[in-house]
Swiss-Prot record:
This is Photosystem I assembly protein Ycf3. One of its GO terms (biological process) is photosystem I assembly. Essential for the assembly of the photosystem I (PSI) complex. May act as a chaperone-like factor to guide the assembly of the PSI subunits. The keyword Mitochondrion does not apply. TPR repeats lie at residues 35-68, 72-105, 120-153. It is a peripheral membrane protein. It is found in: Plastid, Chloroplast thylakoid membrane. The gene is ycf3. It comes from Zea mays (Maize). Belongs to the Ycf3 family. GO terms for cellular component: chloroplast thylakoid membrane. InterPro entries: PSI_Ycf3_assembly, TPR-like_helical_dom_sf, TPR_rpt, Ycf3/AcsC/BcsC/TPR_MFPF. Signal peptide: none annotated.
Amino acid sequence: MPRSRINGNFIDKTFSIVANILLQIIPTTSGEKRAFTYYRDGMLAQSEGNYAEALQNYYEAMRLEIDPYDRSYILYNIGLIHTSNGEHTKALEYYFRALERNPFLPQAFNNMAVICHYRGEQAILQGDSEIAEAWFDQAAEYWKQAIALTPGNYIEAQNWLKITKRFEFE
């Protein structure tokens, strides 16, 4: 039984019902429908913290999905799971792959910046200020890209960029 049919909470049930209706009314191939079903089940598993199950569903969705835009969101979600698991190198790889297919994902740029900023903080704790500055500079570049795509968002990042004099805003 697909995961979407066994969820108990109202939001998950509502999402599943809407997704199933969309699958029926939008003209798509059976492969696209199967890919979306795996993607949807991956999102539900991810929202419940079942990351191994979510990854299995996302990998299957990737195998079936041919649209680069849709694949970008699958890759982004895989990156989120690796971020949650502390696997930052893998997460960065998946965010990069998502952005190759869809360069208009500000949330991917933001998450990459957060990882770089975290690595900069870790370098400071290890006493390596030169490496820390390189990580912070990289974080700044990613945040600038995220902010350029969605100027009203990422206020904390904008403040950090101003405070550290890495970016001037009008």
